[in-house]
């Protein structure tokens, strides 16, 4: 997972998530290897990230980027449905609200994913003291992700999967052959 950030003082690069569940599994199974989850923090990067962490005072900077991008797109297109969507987005941005707080249908989501305005991604606004682990937890929730764990004598591992994933999807994170050969199971 990649998290962009701006307006806050935090280290750029990879950060390990302090996962209490993985820690408990490792204490129980005493594996030779523990594979925790890492997040990559990217300073002032909005395109290649899954979520954006900003200081509350910097929200307008991102909204202005979105407005410029959307206004530029409106000037280049002629399809009424897309223009209506983009005008809806502009009105929302003018209220100083990020696009991630709006609900869109599948067709609108497709257009916005292609356009990729920064505030369409989950925005985590912070002020004052914060802990990196708390930011990661909020980002996981906002991006609708969860962990799938495997643990044994050889390794304890935290695998990132979309929230609500079935067992076959989780198994495919380990190896595609597991997903193909999986018969039945439940995520608990």
Give names to the regions the model predicted.
Residues 1-58:
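Conserved G1/Walker A P-loop phosphate-binding module
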Residues 16, 61, 161-162:
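Residue-level detector of secondary-structure boundary/capping sites
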Residues 47-78:
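Switch/coupling subdomain of P-loop NTPase systems
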Residues 25, 70, 171:
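Residue-level signature of catalytic and energy-coupling elements of molecular machines
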Residues 18, 63-66, 132:
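Generic alpha-helical segment signature
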Residues 1-11, 76-188:
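C-terminal-of-GTPase-core extension/linker across diverse P-loop GTPases
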